[in-house]
């Protein structure tokens, strides 16, 4: 059973999540029951629309992407047509290893000054039309030249096209919880998703580890590179913030 540790950012946050969304016995936060009932009443539109599963955590490095990719392999074993649309590149060998055996679509290349940015290629996924696509970092802001400003808008278009989506997001990126997390950690996150995106998810899986284990991963270079890791340790990833 998944343990609900969210002591790291205060019991107030997890209690609010439970109150708003409900938690089943597997530790998965469910969508608002009224929202699901309304969708089920219109079976045609419900079955044509893609389903959204969010892997939900309290910080980078807790294992959201790892859990998402393991779930992708499980879906593939069940005969589901799965592709990887975008996975954030990080120095995490165990996570990178899980990309093996999955079809990976090329990123969209966007020239920006003297560099080339790599973004999720929405059109490539719609053209390929898999049953399930993996799209990391739901709160990401797209580069200029993409059809939508935010990645969650890309995901909404995929769902409307009847494609299921697995994605990841941290608690501080949810609009209504952002200020609460900022008051606990002292850090404001600019990239946010509207509550409705989270509310309308068909399934939300909590991914969590002890704060000491997370800091150990950070020290070991399993989350960020050295310079980023040191900065993170003195900001969001301080033990005071993670155990607040």
Q: Which stretches of residues belong to each language-model region?
A:
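Short, positively charged and aromatic/hydrophobic N-terminal segments
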Residues: 8-24
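C-terminal accessory "lid"/substrate-recognition subdomains
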Residues: 196-199, 203-244
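Pre-Walker A adenine-sensing motif
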Residues: 35-47
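Conserved nucleotide-binding/hydrolysis micro-motifs of P-loop NTPases
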Residues: 88-93, 139-140, 165, 171-176, ...
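Loop/turn-to-beta-strand initiation segments
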Residues: 81, 129-132, 161-166
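Conserved ATPase-coupling elements of RecA-like P-loop NTPase cores
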Residues: 137-151, 177-179
């Amino acid at each position: 059973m998944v343990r609900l540790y969210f002591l790291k950012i205060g019991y107030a946050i997890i209690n609010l999540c439970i109150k708003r969304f409900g938690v089943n016995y597997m530790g998965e936060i469910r969508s608002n029951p009224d929202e699901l009932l309304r969708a089920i009443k219109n079976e045609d539109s419900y079955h044509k629309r893609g389903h959204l599963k969010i892997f939900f955590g309290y910080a980078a490095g807790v294992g959201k992407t790892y859990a998402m990719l393991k779930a992708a392999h499980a879906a593939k074993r069940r005969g589901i047509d799965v592709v990887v649309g975008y996975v954030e590149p990080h120095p995490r060998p165990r996570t990178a290893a899980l990309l093996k055996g999955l079809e990976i679509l090329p990123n969209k290349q966007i020239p920006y000054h003297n560099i080339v940015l790599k973004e999720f290629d929405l059109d490539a996924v719609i053209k390929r039309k898999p049953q399930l696509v993996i799209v990391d970092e739901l709160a990401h802001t797209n580069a200029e030249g993409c059809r939508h400003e935010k990645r969650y808008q890309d995901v909404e278009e995929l769902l409307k096209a009847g494609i299921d989506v697995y994605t990841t997001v941290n608690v501080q990126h949810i609009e209504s919880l952002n200020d609460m997390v900022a008051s606990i950690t002292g850090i404001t996150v600019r990239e946010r998703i509207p509550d409705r995106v989270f509310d309308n998810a068909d399934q939300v899986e909590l991914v969590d580890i002890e704060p000491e284990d997370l800091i150990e991963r950070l020290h070991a270079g399993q989350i960020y590179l050295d310079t980023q890791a040191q900065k993170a340790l003195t900001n969001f990833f301080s033990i005071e913030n993670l155990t607040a």
